[in-house]
């Protein structure tokens, strides 16, 4: 399994400055509000990425999942995993997340790179069964639809697109993630 890696020609100070500028702040995009009555124990476990806006760290990946578990320090361990058909390898990144405010609000900060954190905002959630979640990052270029199943109903996908579009996300640029049993 290959870990997500930065190109070797980039040095740490340049990467640190760039990363801090891009996701160093923990902020909320205009109009995006975290859900209330968030229950972390129910959110933990495996989620399938159904749709996303494109970013280099996930480019070309299929079968993408996110797995959340408790850390010893009270935070959340995050393992993102996806399959690169081009390289025929699984890529994995491990991060950590902590609540920004109260633990009953779906607003966390997440880091995959040292001390730099970006927003992780759960702005829509199936609060009955915790079967789907709509996620934003620190601005409207970050958007994900997560589901407990790799093939949610089309009506739920349509609900995600409508909600995201109403909030000003570029839904015409969404990437729909392929999930199959043939990877790896």
Question: Where in this protein do the model-derived segments appear?
Answer:
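Bacterial N-terminal signal peptides that target proteins for export
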Residues: 2-14
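A beta-rich soluble binding module of mature secreted/lumenal proteins
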Residues: 19-184
């Amino acid at each position: 399994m290959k870990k997500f890696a930065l190109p070797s020609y980039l040095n740490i100070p340049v990467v640190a400055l760039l990363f801090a500028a891009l996701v160093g702040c923990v902020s909320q995009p205009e109009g995006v509000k975290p859900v209330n009555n968030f229950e972390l124990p129910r959110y933990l476990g495996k989620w399938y990425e159904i749709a996303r806006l494109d970013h280099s760290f996930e480019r070309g990946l299929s079968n993408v999942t996110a797995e959340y578990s408790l850390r010893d320090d009270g935070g959340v361990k995050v393992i993102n995993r996806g399959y690169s058909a081009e390289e025929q390898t699984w890529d994995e990144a491990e991060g950590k997340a902590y609540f920004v405010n109260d633990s009953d609000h779906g607003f966390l900060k997440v880091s995959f790179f040292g001390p730099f954190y970006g927003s992780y905002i759960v702005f829509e959630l199936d609060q009955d069964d915790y079967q789907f979640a709509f996620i934003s990052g620190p601005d409207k270029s970050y958007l994900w639809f997560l589901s407990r199943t790799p093939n949610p109903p089309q009506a739920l996908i349509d609900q995600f697109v409508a909600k995201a579009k109403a909030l000003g996300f570029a839904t015409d640029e969404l990437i729909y993630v392929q999930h199959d049993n043939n990877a790896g």
